[in-house]
A protein has these predicted regions:
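Short, intrinsically disordered, charge-biased short linear motifs at domain edges
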Residues: 37, 46-50, 67-71, 78-79, ...
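Alpha-helix N-cap/helix-initiation motif
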Residues: 51, 81, 202-206
Length: 409
């Protein structure tokens, strides 16, 4: 019988070829579900767990108490608690836990759906498919795969930067006030919601750039399907959270996109340029730790250069680092008023489904960010024009009418 990886590539090739019957007869239904049911959890057990109860390293590695003894042999994953961080997958010594893949259903949509299908790529994509693969070449590649178009999520990071800068300017009025970000990291938000909920009043009610992108596309193109592409497994769980579900239909990782390219004849480096730059420097730098805080700080300086209480940033990356920073906040050792947390070491460039090392990824993102003609969203005509198309004609409108990008924690 095929292993999960063997089955995956066989089914992916059939999907690319347009075949309707993808799964061979007699395969374990858990393997089929892992490859074809993207909305039913993020981590699945594909074979029995034979570890003694006191040696279940997966459960010990889970920060969210999402792994429990199952009715069958082994472990059950609580999809309500799981945030898709991958810690349990890495800790499983029997290779029994796997992450779900969305790529096969996406390929089927590209063949069969009669409406537009948009790819929304996270800014950490810079360099992931080769140093010579520009954003324009990646756009051509995705269109050749069947996508209607490609949008940079960094543009929606620009929108959230503006929103968070406005909220900081409105809400931080004394030396004791402080604000927590980053809305872009589902692990950071999950940590606050599940473990440190007393800090929720200090979290701006903003969706992530991924959700902002999906909502914007669907506001402008109601029949569109949206596919996020990034280095993060936790985004697969985020898209299914009840209060924001529906904005993003599928989440692919860079590794899934690489797998798709491996069964086609497409080579991104050889594709023609289709350059449509629409993100600022600060939006692109969301991809690495410290980028969000720096973006909001620089934008606030342009919004209100004479502000008495300046934005003072502090950042942490990795779950232990984020926990340490939160404990400092709770114990009064703040050393700042704007706190950024990223669940992965290095930020998104260090995500579990990145293709290149995080240090190389950061350099590629910095190079791409430096090439932008716009430093912040304040100068970005693409973002300003999009906001006007959505009905935001002034800065004040965006502060008071930004329901499209709001989230209630």
């Amino acid at each position: 019988m095929d292993t999960l990886d063997e089955l995956y590539f066989k089914m992916l090739k059939k999907a690319v070829d347009g075949e309707l019957e993808l799964a061979p007869e007699g395969m374990d239904p858990r393997l089929i579900d892992c490859l074809t049911l993207p909305n039913d959890g993020t981590v699945v057990r594909v074979k029995p767990c034979l570890c003694p109860p006191d040696e279940r390293h997966c459960a010990a590695a889970c920060e969210w108490d999402a792994l429990k003894p199952g009715n069958e042999v082994g472990i059950a994953v609580d999809t309500e608690k799981c945030v898709g961080c991958q810690a349990c997958i890495d800790a499983c010594e029997l290779d029994s836990l796997k992450a779900k893949k969305d790529i096969i259903p996406v390929v089927q949509e590209l063949h069969q759906y009669d409406g537009p299908v948009y790819a929304l790529v996270a800014p950490a994509i810079a360099g992931q498919f080769g140093a010579d693969v520009t954003m324009g070449k990646m756009r051509s590649t995705l269109k050749a795969l069947g996508f209607t178009g490609m949008l940079e999520v960094a543009a929606f990071a620009d929108i959230l930067t503006l929103k968070e800068a406005l909220e900081f300017d409105k809400n931080i009025n004394s030396e004791g006030d402080f604000q927590l970000t980053s809305c872009c990291c589902p692990m950071w938000i999950a940590m606050i919601k599940k473990l440190y909920h007393q800090l929720l009043p200090n979290v701006p009610g903003s969706v992530s750039p991924m959700i902002a992108g999906g909502r914007t596309v669907k506001a402008l193109h109601p029949k569109a399907k949206t596919v996020f592409i990034g280095p993060c497994l936790a985004k697969k769980a985020e898209k299914n959270e009840p209060d924001i579900a529906g904005a993003i239909d599928y989440v692919l990782t860079y590794q899934e996109l690489r797998d798709l390219l491996s069964v086609t004849d497409l080579k991104p480096a050889d594709m023609p340029e289709d350059a449509q730059p629409h993100a600022s420097t600060t939006g692109i730098t969301y991809a690495y730790a410290g980028g969000v805080a720096a973006a909001v700080k620089r934008t606030l300086e342009k919004l209100n250069p004479h502000r008495k209480i300046k934005l003072q940033t502090r950042k942490a990356d990795g779950v232990p680092g984020c926990k340490a920073m939160i404990n400092d906040i709770l114990e009064g050792r703040r050393d700042g008023n704007f706190f950024e947390g990223m669940g992965c070491i290095g930020g998104c460039v260090g995500g579990p489904r990145a293709i290149i090392p995080k240090e190389e990824g950061k350099k590629c993102v910095q190079t791409y960010a430096d090439s932008s003609a716009f430093e912040t969203p304040m100068e970005n005509p693409y973002v300003i024009g999009m906001l006007k198309e959505l009905g935001f004609n002034t800065v004040e409108d965006f502060l008071t009418k930004s329901h499209l990008y709001d989230r209630q924690f």
